[in-house]
Amino acid sequence: MGIVERIKEIEAEMARTQKNKATEYHLGQLKAKIAKLRTQLLEPPKGSSGGGDGFEVTKYGHGRVALIGFPSVGKSTLLTMLTGTHSEAASYEFTTLTCIPGVIHYNDTKIQLLDLPGIIEGASEGKGRGRQVIAVAKSSDLVLMVLDASKSEGHRQILTKELEAVGLRLNKRPPQIYFKKKKTGGISFNTTTPLTRIDEKLCYQILHEYKIHNAEVLFREDATVDDFIDVVEGNRKYIKCVYVYNKIDVVGIDDVDRLARQPNSIVISCNLKLNLDRLLARMWDEMGLVRVYSKPQSQQPDFDEPFVLSADRGGCTVEDFCNQVHRTLVKDMKYALVWGTSARHYPQHCGLFHHLEDEDVVQIVKKKVREEGGRGRFKSHSNAPARIADREKKAPLKQ
């Protein structure tokens, strides 16, 4: 029996099992088994060379956005309109057969937009080219799920289920659970909050399913069984997703209003070029990019080429800014002068851990360099004669 058949068999058993207090431990073990099998399903087959016709393209710019959706929902047309890159579009399905990259120039930044082939139901099980598409989505900073407004409800549920099956968690944050494997000592279980959806016995059974007998577990929130399994697996990707409802020109105004009010959603029409500017603004807000302008000493700030930081990738502190400028700037910095939204007054003297906001201006003041062998004194650039104390002392005269 293959992995896919075993997964379907366990899912059928879960569907037959009634959910109550007596069966919750059994259902928790079944969920752990399915998670293990899905992880095995994503692993490359043994003996393979690792090559093949992949979709991965080199990362470019300050962020990456992936277009995911069913075939013929307008992904290629949207890429062409936002980036100017030609992607073949037609009225029939599976027009796009490979990954087509484009670049969006927005707010002095460059954002890479990827047009991925349409995925079908069962993509997480290897149908079509779903695995390759989802692998590229995992490397993105934001997912735009493009949906047909006339049949969006069913498509949205199917796509979300396929992405969840391969470890993508859309619009969720990592659970506040500390988990660490140990070599000895057994399982240490602690919690800082009352648990209502999982207990210590169920955690032991899940860890036993993974053949883990020595570990530290600490719950900092009232998490679920699925949250704990995600932490044990350790390969989940938490990514933001915006649901883009295209082709709103073919549905009624009531349907458009209903779709626009759903969370994390935006309505557009590529045919009428409607609401594309708001889509770009929404992408910018979701990615959380922060532009920081550098100011050399005694010079005007450079507003042409900003340094782009991100809270999701690295951070937005003065230390992160220094690392982008040069890797040795952190140890050479004495303090930073900051102008902008994050500063209380202009300029504000800040340290390495000061959090920067969008369009801040930063000037780095370096430490003075000490002269070699000069007893800790600073280098002097003047032509003044050396002090008497600095001159080489002569040996005393012999009596």
Swiss-Prot record:
InterPro entries: Beta-grasp_dom_sf (IPR012675), DRG (IPR045001), G_OBG (IPR031167), GTP-bd (IPR006073), GTP-binding_2 (IPR031662), GTP1-OBG_CS (IPR006074), P-loop_NTPase (IPR027417), Small_GTP-bd (IPR005225)
Transmembrane residue ranges: none
UniProt GO cellular component terms: mitochondrion
Main location: cytoplasm
GO molecular function terms noted in the UniProt entry: GDP binding; GTP binding; GTPase activity; mRNA binding
Residues in TGS domain copies: 288-366
Classification via Gene3D superfamilies: 3.10.20.30, 6.10.140.1070
Lineage top rank: taxon: Eukaryota
Swiss-Prot/TrEMBL keywords: Cytoplasm, GTP-binding, Nucleotide-binding
Cellular location(s): Cytoplasm
The protein's role, per its UniProt record: Binds GDP and GTP, and has low GTPase activity.
Family: Belongs to the TRAFAC class OBG-HflX-like GTPase superfamily. OBG GTPase family.
NCBIfam families: small_GTP
Protein name per the record: Developmentally-regulated G-protein 2
Naturally occurring in which organism (per UniProt): Arabidopsis thaliana
Gene label: DRG2
